[in-house]
């Protein structure tokens, strides 16, 4: 008797099916969604057609601030205090705006440009501060960037910082307050996800963004920027980014 042939969808096949399902889902959702999915083990990367769109970053840029502060400390440009570390933790845990304001003023330089000047070093080559929205410029709260930039930044964090700094950030992102347990969090607890979310009602409508990782050793990274463009609200965007993350990441092998 000849053995029965059977096809099993694993690896690249599984990823392709997930991406097809994800793109079909996004076609039913309000607004424009850019995403970049990366498998750090195989090197496979998928970026959809909106990954290069310029979108308000909202609070995802706080992760970039944390990366920059650790990088500057490693370069001997500053020495972070216990208070600084506590504020960085608040930015990641509850997305604390006051903590971000303090650190932006404390380490942004007299003209507030140091963070923006540094962001390209971490792959955020298209980030642009936006004028006309407050007394301070540039200001962390009014910036636009791309999903590609967020992908580069989270991967810099995982590979280029000192191991103890990366471990500190990973732990913080895996233990966020319930206010941020959406987006990449949708990968599910067995995937040990971590994320930094950003949500805000901006000029042009709500944005709901998420950037993070999932899987053993943070194997997979996912960056998502959802510009609702007036077609939906915060709840819609959070639902979209969470379901997208579930489709792409849940139970990945």
Residue ranges and their predicted role:
Residues 31-33, 37-54:
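Short, conserved catalytic-motif segment at the N-terminal edge
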Residues 73-125:
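Conserved catalytic neighborhood of penicillin-recognizing serine enzymes
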Residues 1-8:
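Secretory targeting and sorting signals
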Residues 140-201:
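A conserved catalytic-loop motif detector
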Residues 106-161:
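Mid-domain, small-residue-enriched loop/turn segments at the edges of structured enzyme/sensor domains
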Residues 9-23, 27-29, 53, 161-174, ...:
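Structured C-terminal helix/loop/strand segments within mature extracytoplasmic catalytic/sensor domains
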Residues 43, 54-78, 91, 222:
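Active-site SXXK
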Residues 38-40, 91-96, 103-107, 123-124, ...:
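Active-site-proximal beta-strand/loop segments in catalytic clefts of secreted hydrolases
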